[in-house]
Amino acid sequence: MEFRIGEALIGEGFEVAHVDLIIGTKDSPAGIAFANALANLSAGHTPLLAVLRPNLITKPPAVIVPKVTVKDMHQAELIFGPAQAAVAKAVADAVEEGIIPRERADEYVVVASVFIHPNAKNKHKIYYYNYGATKLAIKRAMQNFPDVDTVLYEKDRSFHPFVGRKLTKLWDPPYLQIAIDIPDLGEVLKVLEQIPDSDHIVFEVGTPLAKRYGCEVILKLREVKPDAFYILDLKTLDVGNLEARMAADATANAVVISGLAPTSTIVKGIREAEKTGILSYVDMMNVDDPIKRLEEIQKAGVLPNVVELHRAIDSEDKEPPWMLAGKIKEKFSVLVAVAGGIRPENVEEVIAAGADIIVVGRAVTKARDVEGAVRKFMSHMKPDTDQFRIMTDF
């Protein structure tokens, strides 16, 4: 028994071809799906056999299932015409080229789910796009593409055409974290508009802003920066699970818990963050011994994703916070964010000390040239992910 899955997208415009494909032996789930497709017809999604010409099906047999509801004869003509012929030719050529073993052609069946946009018109594009997509989907299925290593490499680099690139993890440090402590939403939005897009810039929704407008202020910020990574700085001291859930419900990507909170509160907050798919920060501002505090949290069975060594605005005459970053990373599997006293001229020193996340606030948000200030910091950091990679389908 053999069961394989493949997928491919080729082309552009309304004629773009997107093929989801199952190929397998007749005694596998592929065989059951093939039989069900032909036996259980659905209005607007009637499956049809792929034929090279009338009265000549392919080997292996292939059934085509329209993804988009067929509502008129124009759409039906495109499915029963160029799409059907393209899938059939792709299957036959896959056998001829050895993608599907010739000696096993009678053992396999193919189920191809085909997308034809209601506004598609150019039959030549429909044919060639669907031919290429079907053959590529078969090849990927037979090669078990992608392997797990490819998926893990690509998952944070991928740009989805309808969604964009959504950061859910801080996987490629260092990052510039811009702390937005301005308690005026109008001014905040003006600042955001001036900050260049980069997947190495993340935004901290500061406590004053969150207190004034509530957690869901993030939704307002997403109107300007929809794909950005937002850290909601609640400085949680109690009900850690509740506040972490509130952050997640507001589409925050991370929540900040105070290191001064009871250990039980921190643990509940971290676990709720894990449950809801967001990251957890523990802010060590005013914590006398951050390493000891982390040991206590670890002993309780958890660790945050990020530890923030935070020198408060009112304490900027104290020792730079990044001096402790290396020691923390030696003992704990966490990212370290540092805040306070960071300027473009000392960014490289801070990173060399072990910081993964550089937190700046007024140096950007109060700058006369916001974009210029950001670029000064970013000049000491990495370029965007795959900025110099030539992308085709992959």
UniProtKB/Swiss-Prot annotation:
Name the UniProt record assigns to this protein: Bifunctional enzyme Fae/Hps
Function: Catalyzes the condensation of formaldehyde with tetrahydromethanopterin (H(4)MPT) to 5,10-methylenetetrahydromethanopterin.
Segments passing through the bilayer: none
Alphabetical GO biological process terms: 'de novo' pyrimidine nucleobase biosynthetic process; carbohydrate biosynthetic process; L-ascorbic acid catabolic process
Binding positions for substrate per the UniProt entry: D20, L49, K67, T69, Q84
Pathway recorded for this protein: Carbohydrate biosynthesis; D-ribose 5-phosphate biosynthesis
Keyword Lyase: yes
Organism this protein belongs to: Archaeoglobus fulgidus (strain ATCC 49558 / DSM 4304 / JCM 9628 / NBRC 100126 / VC-16)
Name of the gene: fae-hps
Residue span of region Formaldehyde-activating enzyme: 1-162
